[in-house]
Curated annotation (Swiss-Prot):
Keywords: Activator, DNA-binding, Transcription, Transcription regulation. The gene is fis. Residues 74-93 bind DNA. This is DNA-binding protein Fis. It comes from Yersinia pestis. InterPro entries: Fis_DNA-bd (IPR005412), Homeodomain-like_sf (IPR009057), HTH_Fis (IPR002197), Trans_regulatory_Fis (IPR050207).
Amino acid sequence: MFEQRVNSDVLTVATVNSQDQVTQKPLRDSVKQALKNYFAQLNGQDVSDLYELVLAEVEQPLLDMVMQYTRGNQTRAALMMGINRGTLRKKLKKYGMN
């Protein structure tokens, strides 16, 4: 579950521990842990498209949720994301979301 803390620019992830307590941790911590797991699975192999891989993993759900939040209003979505509407349209097309 993702939510943004009020009065903060930090996105957080809600997690449930073994005592069924809900805790919040910054999204970046989850990304860092996912990358640690990914590197552990590489077994020393090199990878050439890591930036694009990580960006796609974050960008697609971001676009999806923003478009849902704005009820498909691309102008509002672009403003919310701080990008040009043409850039938004290009990204939506890239992920087959147009």
